[in-house]
């Protein structure tokens, strides 16, 4: 008996037997300890054989442990030095060596030892383990392979370990129904039916349904809807991760891969191997001086001994497979295109039953149509049908979560009851009459509340129970349909008619009755919602993208109708500009904008300080209740020709390639924004070439080749071009407008200006507008003082004084802000610090002999 001839699992079993003996305080390794060592191996061969024989592994282990306890124990601690093999155990190992030679194996494996044990140990007959049955199961697992290395188990039933049988999964109903894709499946069948190079590879963008095509082929094989050459074939989906995982020693991965390929080869063409993400085979398992999986496949692929279906994305095909021409020419490509919206709707209708059964909710057809159309319109960085399926799944999960959670009304009652209970505990400690009276009132209120809570809880439980019944009936219907499919395949017409006209008809009637009951109860103030509608889909799209696609509420409609008035409250003296912008937003919100262009694009022209940038910020505030959704790009930073890369990201090979562009990254994260290009005349003219496709098609390709969607943005550009003409003519006559337009045309190319929706000229601010701005500025100052509870009042004289002194037509409203800071805010700050103006006081700001004075009133 040569220990060098032991396989890894044999050594592991003996070591386990040593530990069991030491734990049992026995100085010799009994045959039962060795048997336990074999049976307790994780993922070992012997536990697998026992399970395939239909025996209870845990029962055998417990019986052997009882036998172990019958042997004498020693009092001293047992160490590795003073432990030895029992005479009978030694005899079993010698017999195992003879069995190894009889089976023409090179190494002593666990199956040899277990066979020797069955022959030598009568206890196994008690468990119902016969030699004939053992050898039959062993040969089914082992086949005609010989033990010619120290890890032979790696080559036994490798497909069962490292792959899944898709045809079997389809038989069990674990694969979703595949709708459409007939031309791709037919082409795959044609390629597989070839004599040589019969290996199709499906290439397409992530999420277009490459894996689904192979699952569809598996379903067709199951239904017999394939040519004779493919009937009764099996498709095994190989798990490359499991194949590589745990391959510690050099050559172990190759051994597993060889086992897979040999098993496929020995099936005589009955097994088709499906490798999802096939680019992972290039370089998989490669180490110094060893082959990768791709090179191991090549010879068999070329000879047609191996039928492989691969699936990978276009980018990864180009990056990995095309770089290896010898591997590429062995595959025949099938391009899988993204389905259109109509095809996606058909796919979703086919999957509807599966999702309804899983989540226990009802999915309306409007939700399905909305999922396909909204995902196509708003989720641009993913592909159909995957993104639409995800929308339906998440919306159904949201409704299911709401069903399982406590309804809001009941939750409020529970919280209120808890609050009253706390109050009762506190009042019980009081002894005065008022507290006792209050205690009685609260106890009565709590009793009423608990009664109401009890009624609502009962109603909630009943509604949940009804919905749960529907879910269970749907699950039963699904199981009956699976049985019907099986009966149809086996041509068992008696069973098929029994199921179809008996069990299925009864269940469908039961489902209809239960559904009608839930619908009837639902009309009477139901606590739970059990339907996925278009509103839920719109809600999920809004959460994913930040774009408000849900139906407009009455308050939002009201807000949009009065958008012009709301903006005028903050922006003074530019009524024409405000009207143009507000009208554009109204058209967009009502759904009348061009769906392939931004919501609107404007150039604001005018002198400095007239409110061009402020209007953009105010618009964002009114649309989003925050100025954070303004993406501001200061064009003075783009004075060089090459600085355009900062907008869209550096090209490959340049520093900053991975970081993306300032504009594209901002819109990818916030696709619903106001984009403000400030001071556009300061930028290099070539920078605007990149904006042409944004203004025309509402899209821009960044430095990494990703398409960024600008269809939900409002683009505003500001400029001081022609401001000297505007200052000379405050009333903006037609002649002045033409002069400004001519100067603009001289600066920018016609193809750029032609794509702008509207060019708006801002007037220079007149004195009445400045007075309104003074009032707004003083109101802002009052808001700053709110934490100190100081209110401000100011006289009309004061407003006129500030307007006349701070106004400069060349500089607009900006000098006004500086003047208020200098003359009012500084003086007021000094008075607050000197305690001349106190908290919770009312301060009048007035004028006295052309001096600003502060009085507490």
From Swiss-Prot:
Organism: Fusobacterium nucleatum subsp. nucleatum (strain ATCC 25586 / DSM 15643 / BCRC 10681 / CIP 101130 / JCM 8532 / KCTC 2640 / LMG 13131 / VPI 4355)
Residues that coordinate or bind ATP 2: 606-613
Source taxon at top rank: Bacteria
Pfam families linked to this entry: AAA, AAA_2, AAA_lid_9, Clp_N, ClpB_D2-small
Protein residues bound to ATP 1: 204-211
Record GO terms (molecular function): ATP binding; ATP hydrolysis activity
NCBIfam families: chaperone_ClpB
Renumbered residue ranges of the record's region C-terminal: 765-857
Assembly and oligomerization: Homohexamer. The oligomerization is ATP-dependent.
Primary localization class, coarse: cytoplasm
Localization, UniProt: Cytoplasm
Family under the similarity heading: Belongs to the ClpA/ClpB family.
Entry keyword set: ATP-binding, Chaperone, Coiled coil, Cytoplasm, Nucleotide-binding, Repeat, Stress response
Residues in coiled coil: 389-523
Protein task: Part of a stress-induced multi-chaperone system, it is involved in the recovery of the cell from heat-induced damage, in cooperation with DnaK, DnaJ and GrpE. Acts before DnaK, in the processing of protein aggregates. Protein binding stimulates the ATPase activity; ATP hydrolysis unfolds the denatured protein aggregates, which probably helps expose new hydrophobic binding sites on the surface of ClpB-bound aggregates, contributing to the solubilization and refolding of denatured protein aggregates by DnaK.
Region (Repeat 2): 85-144
Domain Clp R: from-to ranges: 3-144
PANTHER family: ATP-DEPENDENT CLP PROTEASE, HEAT SHOCK PROTEIN 104
Stretch list, region NBD1: 157-338
Domain commentary: The Clp repeat (R) domain probably functions as a substrate-discriminating domain, recruiting aggregated proteins to the ClpB hexamer and/or stabilizing bound proteins. The NBD2 domain is responsible for oligomerization, whereas the NBD1 domain stabilizes the hexamer probably in an ATP-dependent manner. The movement of the coiled-coil domain is essential for ClpB ability to rescue proteins from an aggregated state, probably by pulling apart large aggregated proteins, which are bound between the coiled-coils motifs of adjacent ClpB subunits in the functional hexamer.
Gene Ontology annotations for the cellular component aspect, listed alphabetically: cytoplasm
Positions of region (Repeat 1): 6-71
Annotated protein name in UniProt: Chaperone protein ClpB
Gene assigned in the entry: clpB
A Gene Ontology BP annotation from the UniProt entry: protein refolding
